[in-house]
Amino acid sequence: MLTLFKARSVITMNDSLPRASAVLVRDGVVLEVGEEVTMAPWLRGQDYVVDDQFADKIICPGFIDPHLHPSMAAVLLPMEFITAMRWKLPWGEVEPVTTEAAFDQRMATLVAEKDPQQPLFIWGYHQLWHGAMSKARIESIAGQRPTVVWHRSFHELYMNSAAMEMVGVVAEDIKPGMQINIERGHFYEGGLGYAINRLNPWILAPDKYAAGLQRLKQVVHHGGHTSIGDLATGMFNFSAEAEALSQSLEGDDVPFRTRLVARPRLRGRRSICRRNHLPGIY
C-alpha cells in the first residue's frame, strides 16, 4: 500500500531539492520526496492513502550520533540509574537525585529491593552532586554485597571489597601509575581498563549484553536517530562485541544505520579485518 504524507515543509538536505512538501512511502520504504503533483506517475492506477498527520509540521532528516559507543550503551542501560539528571527512557522515567544523602538513600533502596545473590551495578554518580565516593562509603550501605558505582562520565568507577574479590582484583598487583586507588576502590582512566577486563564476565554476560543492545535500539529510535557511529568498537572485548553487534544491529527491526570502526589501540591487522567483515554493518 502506498501512503502519501503531506507536510508544511520537508527539509531534505539535498542541494538539488532543498525543500519539498510531500513524501511517498510504500511498506516503510521512501519512494520519492517532492511535491504531490510530481508523484502522479507513482499513484496512477494504484491504491493509496493520503496521511495528513504532518500537514502543519516540518519533516526533517533523522539525527546522526557519531559518538555513541553501542557496546558502552548496552553495558550501561541494564544498570540501575542514580543520576543528577532526569532520564526519559522508552521503558520508564528516572527521577533526578541531586544530593549526597539522596544518593545514599537510593542506593540503600536498591540494595534492599534487588536480588541479593546478584552483584549490584549503579551508574550515574557524579561528585558535584553526590559527594566523594569510596569503597568505605559503598560498604556502609551495601555491606559485603558486590557493588559497583560507575561514574557518569564512564571513565571511572568504584568497587567495594566484595566486588573486588568477586572479579579478582589483587591488591599486591596494583603498582604506582596504574591509576588505581585500591584503598578507595577507585579505578579511573587507565585503571578503568584493568577493572573492565575483570568485570567483563558480568557486564558482557550474553543475556545481559543482548538485553542491553535491545534497549539501545529502543533508545536510538526513541530519540529520532537514523545513523549512529562508534570509533572504539572493541573497548570491552572485540570478539564478543563484534559477534553480538552483527546479530543485533542489522535486520528489518533496526530502524537506523550503524558505522563501526575498531578501537585504534587494538593491535595488528586482524582486528581491523574482522571489523571490515561485519555483515550488514557499514
Kindly give the residue locations of the regions a language model identified:
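Divalent metal-binding segments
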Residues: 2-6, 11, 15-26, 30-277
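Non-catalytic terminal/interface segments that mediate subunit docking, oligomerization
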Residues: 278-282
